[in-house]
Amino acid sequence: MLDKFSKGRSASAHVIVLGNEKGGSGKSTVASHVAVGLLKAGQRVATIDLDARQQSFTRYINNRRAWAARAGLDLEVPAHFCIEQGRTMRIADDEELECQRLIDAVNALERNVDFIVIDTPGTDSYLSRLAHSTADTLITPMNDSLLDFDVLGSVDPTTYAVTGVAHYAAMVRQVRRRRRQLDGSNIDWIVMRNRS
């Protein structure tokens, strides 16, 4: 999947992915702040929402655009795509379709922007894993709770020592390793405390 995506890219905007398999961790909120912060800093920014079911990021961008128009303000608003998951009866066809949709969106955006901010759903999916593997920077927001930490590692309930790597951290480790093997680049991974 990453091989095809890398071959399909035409330029080199910095891709920032907000990811965490746990819902409610603050991915869409942080994605909105990152995108607007970059716009306010004078950067050219585009955004992609991969959570087509919930569309929190998409609604934020659309509401910002509509409010600016109603208020007559020249407010910074990024170019935006919302990408749906494939819905055929064949997994391979869905994955091919999702990969192509993401390639097309990134190609349409990255020639004209400095940053692409991608918001992912709070579930494991092919499209989410593909986005993770294409990140230059991955930001994982999490709340200050052992329930949120559970996607990163197992914790001994008595000593609070980390006793193992959990499913999400294992997936991130895998895509980072694959990216290094493919093109020699590193994915910077930032785990941030949210709502502190």
PLM regions: where:
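Conserved catalytic-core segment of NTP-binding enzymes
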Residues: 41, 118-196
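Intrinsically disordered or low-complexity boundary/linker segments at protein termini
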Residues: 10-14, 153
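Pre-Walker A adenine-sensing motif
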Residues: 1-10
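Active-site signature of alpha/beta-hydrolase-fold catalytic machinery across serine-
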Residues: 33, 37, 130
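Hydrophobic positions on the alpha1 helix immediately C-terminal to the Walker A/P-loop
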Residues: 30
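P-loop/Walker-type NTP enzyme "switch/lid" segment
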Residues: 15-25, 39-115, 122, 157, ...
